Design a protein with these regions (language model features):
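Repeated loop/turn-to-beta-strand initiation elements of outer-membrane beta-barrel proteins
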Residues: 81-86, 114-118, 150-157, 182-185, ...
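Surface-exposed strand-loop-strand hairpins of Gram-negative outer-membrane beta-barrel proteins
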Residues: 56-71, 87-94, 239-241, 277
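Transmembrane beta-strand segments of Gram-negative outer membrane beta-barrel proteins
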Residues: 40-55, 81, 195
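Outer-membrane beta-barrel translocator/channel fold
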Residues: 57, 62, 119-174, 178, ...
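Cleavable N-terminal export/targeting peptides
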Residues: 1-43, 277-280, 294-296
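Short loop/turn motifs that connect adjacent beta-strands in outer-membrane beta-barrel proteins
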Residues: 36-45, 112-117, 180-193, 257-261, ...
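Outer-membrane beta-barrel "beta-signal"
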Residues: 175, 281-296
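Outer-membrane beta-barrel pore domains and translocons
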Residues: 52-56, 88-92, 109, 121-127, ...
Length: 296
């Protein structure tokens, strides 16, 4: 009953801008213009290097770092502040080989007018063969996003598709409110804040085991299980599938910005709304720290 009320209370809060009118899909931070705020000038070519740390990597409703801290290095090429191509290498604590998996990303964004923008992205997660049983199988994710600037809030509606051993669709709705301090250091730096709330929708599978009835979520890069690997004995029988709310999360990114670098810290609170005992994303706080430096 508590989960039921929480789901619809969260939905009401997140849909508030729609009521007033009737204020991303890689977990690796990437440089690039948030289309809710305008770049001061257009640069034809740009190149960035970056690195970051996180206490846990949650992606599409589940932990793909197996609840381990992670670190990463990244290089990103940008064209006209609209098209970005990046490659990231991720290290997980206590995992061999040292680089546990790689992420390739291609993103495009375009501002249509003062209140509407569109973007598209495709992401490839590649893991060494020796870790496919431990972590996940290789998969590709693509999404299309529309952004709406309501002045008080900035809203994103995203539709995405996962291509792996089991293809599936996702829907995300995110509200954020970007603001920044006056510039300092002779107009060369500022501190920005971008608090947000996000709803993730995806395929939920209700199953029966010998012990109980549970709701599982399809997880990226992991084929749906007929046997529960948590104890090795219970047989899982799927009874129904539905498209519903998988997760609610809230975050507060704080960034120090200059002309040539951005250093960002983020605290994120994750609230999963299903009870998969094997691959469930953890409930609670996650911390992330990243830095990007402009080479040219």
């Amino acid at each position: 009953m508590k989960i039921f009320l929480l789901r619809y209370l969260s939905l009401l809060i997140l849909l508030l801008p729609a009521g007033v009118l009737a204020q991303n899909s890689s977990k690796i931070s990437l440089p690039g213009a948030d289309t809710s705020k305008t770049e001061s000038k257009t640069v034809r070519h740009s190149l960035y290097s970056g690195a970051g740390y996180g206490s846990n990597m949650i992606y599409l409703g589940s932990t793909i770092s197996q609840n381990q801290p992670y670190g990463y290095g990244n290089i990103t090429y940008g064209f006209r502040n609209q098209l970005y191509a990046s490659v990231s290498a991720v290290h997980l604590s206590g995992t061999d080989p040292f680089l546990a998996f790689y992420i390739g990303a291609l993103n495009y964004s375009h501002v249509i007018n003062s209140w509407l923008d569109i973007s598209a992205g495709i992401y490839r997660y590649q893991v060494p063969r020796s870790l496919t049983d431990t972590l996940f199988s290789n998969f590709t994710y693509g999404d299309l996003t529309m952004g709406f600037d309501w002045k008080l809030l900035y809203s994103k509606l995203s539709v995405g598709g996962l291509f792996s051993e089991e293809n599936q669709a996702y829907f995300q709705f995110r509200n954020s409110r970007y603001f920044q301090t006056p510039e300092f250091f002779k107009g060369k730096a500022n501190i920005s804040f971008d608090p947000y709330a996000n709803l993730l929708f995806g395929k939920l599978i209700e199953v029966e085991t010998t012990a109980e009835t549970s709701v599982f979520a399809s997880t990226p890069g992991r084929k749906w299980r007929q046997n529960d690997t948590s104890n090795g004995t219970s047989t899982i029988t799927p009874t129904s599938e539905r498209f519903g709310i998988m997760e609610v999360d809230f975050g507060l990114p704080v960034a120090f910005n200059t002309d040539f670098m951005t250093i960002e810290a983020e605290v994120n609170y994750v609230l999963p709304l299903y009870n998969d005992p094997v691959y469930r994303s953890p409930k609670g706080f996650i911390f992330m720290l990243s830095g990007f430096f402009r080479i040219f």
